[in-house]
């Protein structure tokens, strides 16, 4: 995919850089693989705001994406590549030999007409899924399970990938984009290749309205608020906040480590923070 820039006939087009999606399918999604999606506006079941700066945006329908690749050893053909408003990656509509349709995450270098398959002993080619124990060391992968049968959780956003760098006592060693090295069971499935739409990292919205179309409201800084609204608020003139960055509720933020899942610490061989030293 290439990037598109525009002749600035309006101010909003001067900085605008978007992904060229001309090669994607232009029709509607498959009705049996979609369902309605209601906009929550960052509210919970009590109507209270639990996620700030969300709301509005274009209406969406949710596409059921198969992260488990549940149909094993049945070849499928890629019917088309589609845009999905619920994720940064593109999705591929595949048709199995028995006629069943399914959506999967589209990897890079997957084209219409290609054949994909999920199974224990399949070729190493983009879109094919197999257990980590059956892959050669060095393979670039995405949509990696953390527990066998749970469905892919690691490396699912646009351009993301992990690399199989070794094996150890029934576990596979993965290097993630963040620099973290992690142990995952060799029985976990993963898909070969990197996720599509790597140019997503280079887009520029060009205007505030394009963020609003996505359901993002203005992100107000604490130093621009009053003391009643934020610990950084108030002061005469412009201030730096006067203290280390905190959330509106006084909790340290911006770099403060929040990981507290000690049960899974044993699966992290090298943290993402170590490469920064």
Swiss-Prot record:
Family assignment from sequence similarity: Belongs to the universal ribosomal protein uL2 family.
Record keyword RNA-binding present: yes
GO cellular component: large ribosomal subunit
Known role: One of the primary rRNA binding proteins. Required for association of the 30S and 50S subunits to form the 70S ribosome, for tRNA binding and peptide bond formation. It has been suggested to have peptidyltransferase activity; this is somewhat controversial. Makes several contacts with the 16S rRNA in the 70S ribosome.
Subunit (UniProt): Part of the 50S ribosomal subunit. Forms a bridge to the 30S subunit in the 70S ribosome.
Example of a GO MF term: transferase activity
Gene3D superfamilies with a match to the protein in the record: 2.30.30.30, Nucleic acid-binding proteins, Ribosomal protein L2, domain 3
Keyword entries, A-Z: Ribonucleoprotein, Ribosomal protein, RNA-binding, rRNA-binding
GO biological process: cytoplasmic translation
Record PANTHER family: LARGE RIBOSOMAL SUBUNIT PROTEIN UL2M (PTHR13691:SF5), RIBOSOMAL PROTEIN L2 (PTHR13691)
Organism name: Bartonella henselae (strain ATCC 49882 / DSM 28221 / CCUG 30454 / Houston 1) (Rochalimaea henselae)
Protein name: Large ribosomal subunit protein uL2
Chain segments carrying region Disordered: 222-277
InterPro entries: NA-bd_OB-fold, Rib_uL2_dom2, Ribosomal_uL2, Ribosomal_uL2_bac/org-type, Ribosomal_uL2_C, Ribosomal_uL2_CS, Ribosomal_uL2_dom3, Ribosomal_uL2_RNA-bd_dom
